Amino acid sequence: MASPALISETEAWKDLKAHLEGIKMTHLRELMGDTERCQSMMLEFDNIFLDYSRQQASPDTISKLYRLADAAHLKQKIDHMYNGDHINSTENRSVLHVALRAPRNLAICSDGKNVVPDVWNVLDKIKDFSDRVRNGSWIGATGKELKDVIAVGIGGSFLGPLFVHTALQTDPEASKNARGRELRFLANVDPIDVARNISGLSPETTLVVVVSKTFTTAETMLNARTLREWISSALGPSAVAKHMVAVSTNIPLVEKFGIDPNNAFAFWDWVGGRYSVCSAVGVLPLSLQYGFAVVEKFLQGAHSIDQHFSSAPFEKNIPVLLGLLSVWNVSFLGYPARAILPYSQALEKLAPHIQQVSMESNGKGVSIDGLPLPFESGEIDFGEPGTNGQHSFYQLIHQGRVIPCDFIGVVKSQQPVYLKGEVVNNHDELMSNFFAQPDALAYGKTPEQLKKENVSEHLIPHKTFTGNRPSISLLLPTLDAYRIGQLLAIYEHRVAVQGFVWGINSFDQWGVELGKSLATQVRKQLHGSRVKGEPVEGFNFSTKTLLTRYLEATSDVPADPSTLLPNI
């Protein structure tokens, strides 16, 4: 008998649907009262502790989710990914970001070729180059050391490296290595982003890293040309070769741009943009800032989770469990969003990065075979570090819509503070909230409890908390480069698990193309209107009205202006 075309047609899915009503009738207050259940929903790997006991799930739910994983052939799909099979079927590509952090002695193949030696050739080149820049043997055109780096990229070429950079900034080892250095990321084509990036920097001491696989990405290349002009207008055109390097596979265009092709760092088609932080995309700028040794620890941390994900049984597998629970929350309980709530300011850029990894990967409406999905898939991801988020959107999470939450805590702060006479230290104050919030969401507060506290009758409806709001708690021992790598890989693989179970292609992103193609038409119209005075034509009434209004209000912009750079 042929396998069902959609996971929702399997008996395992239907069994979970039937099981759902009983779970909906059971409050988390009752579920949390079962100590044996709670113990069964705790897991530890390499001193990372996961507690998922505050999920709206029983041990029977978890067993049924494992059966769903089997029905989706989850283990086989994971193996296919690690074996280099072309699981990105719409682009006919392998998906091998795990190879980017593999040790030298490991063999991971794509199309019959072990790609790990190629990866390490690039890593060795990055180490050599970043060492030379950091020790002053590679200098700028005027003989000054290059202490400042601007990485130019967008999407996956920006969000992942920015997350890691922000997390490392306050790590003691990394911050010591970065002393006297500056790393900035230029992503938005908005000239304000250019102005902010070059503000306070001198072209003489700045190295620009242009990140574009094809070297044709519109926003990135316009920003790259802008910084090229910033450098060449101050130092002369020949300075570009000393002040700009590339992460790209298109060597002819790199050379045409004015960058020495020897200073181009490769990556491959089997690396998706949102999974590219462990490639030269992230490793080069991060190594320039923190030194290769620190970044290598980050890669080792990611690899440790890669091994765990590929080898641990499902019941002891952190990414698998998190992925299955997300499927449960989205497709069965009907919760469309997830809040990522790290109780560490160093992780302030985690949620924006995972937002892209998750929503670009799993924001699909059809199966990998092109069939419309008859169930909800994908999550709306957002988040903010605690306790900032508590004074922002937690109100809605507690008393509005139900939004499953990921609470991420760190046992030892990167930068501990102790004040004599305080009841608790600063990190304990932070962690008090980390431990309290999941219980507040799970248990809530009943009208009966409020009456016992003599709360006024008219305020009881306003002060009632329904509870029964699911969350997971992930506790990391520290937040160094190794643990940051682990955290990244946990979320990357969790997203893959969701896609594998839903039966979608988590590794393409056709949804970003339509807007880009329409922008090409608008770009052509703006040029024609400014240079030739052409009327706005070929658009619907709304767009025509907006475009005309914009052109009229900017009629003072010259058709062929002289170069003007930000002045800030």
Swiss-Prot record:
Gene Ontology MF term list: carbohydrate derivative binding; glucose-6-phosphate isomerase activity; monosaccharide binding
Pathway(s): Carbohydrate degradation; glycolysis; D-glyceraldehyde 3-phosphate and glycerone phosphate from D-glucose: step 2/4
Enzyme class name: isomerase
One of the protein's GO biological processes: glycolytic process
Record EC number: 5.3.1.9
Entry's Gene Ontology cellular component terms: cytosol
Catalysis: reaction(s): alpha-D-glucose 6-phosphate = beta-D-fructose 6-phosphate
Name assigned to this protein: Glucose-6-phosphate isomerase, cytosolic 1
Biological source species: Clarkia williamsonii
